[in-house]
C-alpha cells in the first residue's frame, strides 16, 4: 500500500464529506436529493433499543455472510459463462424479471424502492422483508458476475434497510434504530471500512444516528470473515 491507514481514513472522510457537500449544494440550488431518501431525525433510543443492539449486529453479520456466499456462487456461474456474454446477460435479465414478479421492491438499484419501503414497510410481513433483503443481495451479485454494469453499494444499503425493518417487525423496537444499526453492520462487515461506512450512510441518516451507525459498523468490521470469502468483500470497497 502506498499510504498508511490514518491517511486512507482521512482520504475516505474527505471524499465522503466532499460528495455529501456537493449533493447538498446541488440540492439547494436545483432541488432534489442526494439520490438516497433521508430518514427522519425523530427516533427512540432507550435501553430497550440498546438491549437489542448486539442482536441487530449479529443479524447484520449473518446477512453479510449471505451476501458473500451469493457473491461466491455468482462468481463461479460468471466464470462458467464468461465466453458466452450474451447468454449470461440474458440470464441475469431473466433473474431480475423473476425477482420483480415475486418481490417488486428488488428492482433497480434500490434508492427509489428504499423510499417506498420507508413509507410502507408495516404493510409487509417480516418474512417478506427478509426475503426481499436476501433476493436483493443475490440479484446484485448475479448482475455483476454475469456481465451487467453497476455496483453493490446502494443495493447493499437497501438490503440493510429491509432487514432492519424485518428486525423491528419481529422485536417491536424503534424501526429507525433497527434500520440504522442493521445497515451499518451489514455494510461495515462487507466493506471492512467502518469510517467510510458511517460517512456514506450519513447521506441518508441524520447525525443523531451516529452512535448506532458507528457502533454497528465498527463491531461488524472487526468480526473475521471466512478465509474463502476475503476476495468477495473487495467488490464492495
Description of each model-found segment:
Residues 1-237:
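Alpha-helical transmembrane segments and immediately membrane-proximal extracytoplasmic
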Amino acid at each position: 500500500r502506498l499510504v498508511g491507514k490514518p491517511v486512507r481514513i482521512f482520504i475516505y472522510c474527505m471524499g465522503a464529506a466532499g460528495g455529501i457537500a456537493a449533493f447538498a449544494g446541488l440540492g439547494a440550488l436545483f432541488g432534489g436529493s442526494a439520490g438516497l431518501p433521508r430518514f427522519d431525525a425523530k427516533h427512540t433510543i432507550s435501553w430497550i433499543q440498546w438491549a437489542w443492539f448486539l442482536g441487530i449486529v449479529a443479524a447484520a453479520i449473518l446477512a453479510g455472510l449471505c451476501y458473500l456466499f451469493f457473491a461466491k456462487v455468482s462468481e463461479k456461474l460468471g466464470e462458467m459463462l464468461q465466453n458466452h456474454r450474451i447468454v449470461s446477460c440474458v440470464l441475469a435479465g431473466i433473474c431480475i424479471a423473476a425477482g420483480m414478479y415475486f418481490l417488486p421492491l428488488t428492482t433497480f438499484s434500490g434508492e427509489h424502492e428504499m423510499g417506498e419501503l420507508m413509507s410502507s414497510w408495516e404493510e409487509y410481513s417480516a418474512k417478506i422483508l427478509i426475503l426481499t433483503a436476501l433476493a436483493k443481495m443475490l440479484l446484485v451479485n448475479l448482475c455483476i458476475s454475469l456481465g451487467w454494469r453497476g455496483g453493490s453499494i446502494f443495493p447493499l444499503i437497501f438490503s440493510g434497510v429491509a432487514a432492519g425493518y424485518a428486525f423491528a417487525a419481529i422485536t417491536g423496537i424503534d424501526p429507525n434504530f433497527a434500520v440504522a444499526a442493521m445497515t451499518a453492520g451489514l455494510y461495515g462487515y462487507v466493506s471492512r471500512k467502518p469510517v467510510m461506512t458511517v460517512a456514506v450512510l450519513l447521506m441518508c441518516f441524520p447525525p443523531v444516528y451516529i452512535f448506532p451507525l458507528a457502533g454497528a459498523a465498527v463491531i461488524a468490521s472487526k468480526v473475521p470473515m471466512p478465509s474463502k470469502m476475503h476476495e468477495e468483500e473487495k467488490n464492495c470497497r
